[in-house]
Amino acid sequence: LAPPGERRADDWAHAASDLLARMDAQGFAAPEARPVRVTSYPSLEDKGRLTRNTRPEHVATPREAAVALIVGRRSPDLWSVAALRLVALGAAASSPWLEPAGAWWAGRWGGEPLERAIARAYFARLLPTAREAASRGDGWRSPLLLVPARAALARSIMECAPARHGAARAALLALLGTAPPGDLDSLCRGAGVEAPKVERRYAALVDSLARAGQSATGAPAPRPWRPADGFVRGVCLAHSVSLERGYLSASCAGELQRLRTLGANWVSLSPFGFVPGAGAPDIAMSADGGPDEETDESVAEAAARARALGLRVLLAPHLWSRGWTGSLEFGTAGWPRFFACYREFLIHYALLAEREGMDGLVIGHELGSATARDPGRWRALAGEVRRVYGGTLTYSANWDHEAEAIGFWDSCDLIGVSFYDPLATAPGATQESMTAAARRALASLKALARRTGRPVLLTEAGYPATPTAALRPWEENRRGVADPEAQRACYDALLTALDSEDWVAGLFVWKWFTAPPAPASADRSYSPAGKPAESVLVRAYSGWRDRPVRVLPRSGP
């Protein structure tokens, strides 16, 4: 496939040649003339469609690396090129240590200098120790922590090899076997080095790299929301579940442009984790899933496209389950495991949000049974997130009084609420009565804003295009006829009620797909795209471009 521009391709080729020359000079020359092929794709979507792998780069065959750039990045990391050289020297292409070792040689990973990734985790006290990095672990672990740590550990093992010709190479290649052992002592025995010496070298190395990483360049840092920024005119951008229609797609780029045109100034992005249900507290991640999922690279791509249009980004990780996540139950023995998994889930997305410069992060979404158990645990989790993430924090409470019961709003910057309060108690409600119902629901949130001294952000607010939209806004009835007029009336009621409430920080409309359903007239989903509700939203957002936000004086303890 033709590279994206001759000059860029030449630059990449020179960078790859320089990398291989450095490996040659340090005793990692290929045993024979062995050309390395780097296939460059115009976009991650193209790469994913043709290879079914949407990672920015991967080892496609023992002699070929496949690369593509996330929007806004100027060059690939080229860890895959270093990995190909290691494979040529005998490393297993399937080794879990191949990518970290390649990242060490390349000096880059995740679109930034390796020392910057290490610094982010190190100063947040999240970087794994040498023993933790060597361990296979119990369950999923964030690659945003594990890959940089293992890169440094691979280098430490090399540096602790005996001072004889070829020893460092032999030590590294021993680490890169098909099935390396899952603990530091066994790894070190296999590599012929002393584990205590490796631990000491690792500790010194990551400290040095982290201090260097403080001044390394990367994406702009998150910019927290402030009341002076004005009203958040947000839209929840939902991933249409396929590569060609989701966050990585050209369709998503078009919808982001459309949202900017209709007056939005923020979008939220929602990667998911799956919880099987009662008695199964583990979380299956989409972060490093298949090409049709909300992977890290797809979220990063959508965020970069949004920022390029002047849109700010709220990262809102969700859990989903076979039942409602607000009533998850794991029993006395299962809850500690759930919280351990959820911590890994949330810290991962905090790291991603910081790396990619996303301005806001939702630390939980409609998890009522979990938030009711231990406010102190949530407060501690928010504290851990703040060590690594510098943007705005909120939690998205369900509309049915969860917000009033939350005991850790003092750890958040905004009161987040999924606003699905009913606007009617029976069919046939008038526009005036629905507006009055919206005002009553907002009044209870205003009392919470006074008690906490924090503005309220409607992290979700929306209505399906169904006849029962005003009665049960939380229910997306996938059967029956579409009723776009009922959806329009609900939006009109909410937006009219919000018009005079300057203590509300903003709202995110639920939801707008990266590839809207067609035809819109028959679509029963929450999306207002192409329906009468869209014009109501455009009118409101156009009128709120300079809308101020007032922080109410705190009246509670």
Task: Report each predicted region and the residues it spans.
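Glycoside hydrolase catalytic-domain groove-lining segments
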Residues: 293-297, 301-312, 316, 376, ...
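Acidic/His/Gly-enriched intrinsically disordered linker/tail segments
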Residues: 62, 93-214
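Juxtacatalytic substrate-recognition/specificity segment
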Residues: 1-95, 136, 140, 182-185
